[in-house]
Amino acid sequence: MANNFSQLAKKSRNELSSSKVKKEVIENPPLEIFKLGNDVLRTNAKRIGKVDLDTRNLAKDMLKSMYSAKGIGLAAPQVGISKELLVIDINFEDSAAEPLILINPEITAFGNTLNSYEEGCLSIPGVYLNVVRPSTIKLRFSDEMGRPRKMNADGLLARCIQHEVDHLRGVLFVDRVTSKEDLKTELKKEGFQMKDVFPISQS
């Protein structure tokens, strides 16, 4: 599942400061993660025109904040920045595994096989519900040096990428939950409200 991911990540090793982030929980992470109900989570992110040091430093701060929250993916809108930038690391426990940094990501193809799997979100802490998504995808993006890349992903990595790309379109995983009763129960339990959910068609 992670072969393609690992190859791409290794190409960035020793090149950039943004991937050199220790996988640890720090007391005061650099970025605040905004929660369900904040308007910034519902805006369309803007493409990044030039990948520069500021972009790489933002990715570095996003990784620090993601690791501190014990997450495996984070999108720039979640930290209040409406830019098309994602950081992903599905191997938090493996200190040698490199994170994946996706700039201006675009999913170019979805596989035909769908599966249901429990998802959570750093912007909706404590809420975990099943979401149906394609099990495989094809993706193109720019890496943190601004170089164009393509990759295939499946399993957890494919799901995580789809989840984070949704954030760039103002979509949250709770919008895709089909069991509204379960959703209402889980949101209420964690202090969130149904009025902040915008259901989308699964067809």
Swiss-Prot record:
Query: SUPFAM superfamilies, per this entry?
Result: Peptide deformylase (SSF56420)
Tell me which domain of life the UniProt entry assigns to the organism this sequence originates from. Answer: Bacteria
| Key words of the record | Hydrolase, Iron, Metal-binding, Protein biosynthesis
A Gene Ontology BP annotation from the UniProt entry: co-translational protein modification
Cofactor note (record): Binds 1 Fe(2+) ion.
Which EC number(s) are documented for this chain? 3.5.1.88
Named cofactor requirement(s): Fe(2+)
Whether Hydrolase counts among this entry's keywords is yes
Q: What class of enzyme is it?
A: hydrolase
Q: Where does Fe cation bind?
A: C121, H163, H167
What reaction is this protein's catalytic activity? N-terminal N-formyl-L-methionyl-[peptide] + H2O = N-terminal L-methionyl-[peptide] + formate
What family does the entry list?
Belongs to the polypeptide deformylase family.
Q: What is the recorded function of this protein according to its Swiss-Prot or TrEMBL entry? A: Removes the formyl group from the N-terminal Met of newly synthesized proteins. Requires at least a dipeptide for an efficient rate of reaction. N-terminal L-methionine is a prerequisite for activity but the enzyme has broad specificity at other positions.
Protein name (Swiss-Prot/TrEMBL) = Peptide deformylase
Organism source for this protein? Prochlorococcus marinus (strain MIT 9515)
